[in-house]
Amino acid sequence: MALKDTAKKMKDLLDSIQHDLAKAEKGNKAAAQRVRTDSIKLEKVAKLYRKESIKAEKSGLLKRKPSTKAPAKVKKTAEKKAPKKSSAAAAKTSKAVKASKPASKKTAAKKVKKPSKARGFRK
């Protein structure tokens, strides 16, 4: 299969999955099954697409267009200066204030187990 055919097949599968997903959300069980099977097909086609695209790139079939953006400018790194003593002293005092406050305890919410709606096994 050619790369274009594989891409078209992937698009068709994606459209099909999206269409069936809308139906499955409304409760259509057949559509949910189609979504599951189509997603498996899509996975296989995606693997094939990856293989074909790598092969095409190596052989030169896929040519990348040169970017229209200008190359990024290199920024000069500024030298780091030592922090001022006043800010260091302020940081120490803020730590002391935080340490003096008592830690408030939050009560964890208990999880309530809901009874299951499943029926028991029939004998």
UniProtKB/Swiss-Prot annotation:
**Its Gene Ontology molecular function terms?**
DNA binding; structural constituent of chromatin
Show the InterPro entries listed in the entry. Answer: Hc1
> Where is there biased composition of kind Basic residues?
61-75, 103-123
Q: Which UniProt keywords apply?
A: DNA-binding, Repeat
Q: Where is the composition biased (Low complexity)?
A: 85-102
Where are the disulfide bridges? none
Q: Where is this region: Disordered?
A: 54-123
Pfam families in the cross-refs: Hc1 (PF07432)
The UniProt entry's sequence similarity note says: Belongs to the histone H1/H5 family. HCT subfamily.
Q: What does this protein do?
A: Might have a role analogous to that of eukaryotic histone proteins.
Question: What name does this protein carry?
Answer: Histone H1-like protein HC1
UniProt source species: Chlamydia pneumoniae (Chlamydophila pneumoniae)
Tell me the gene name.
Answer: hctA
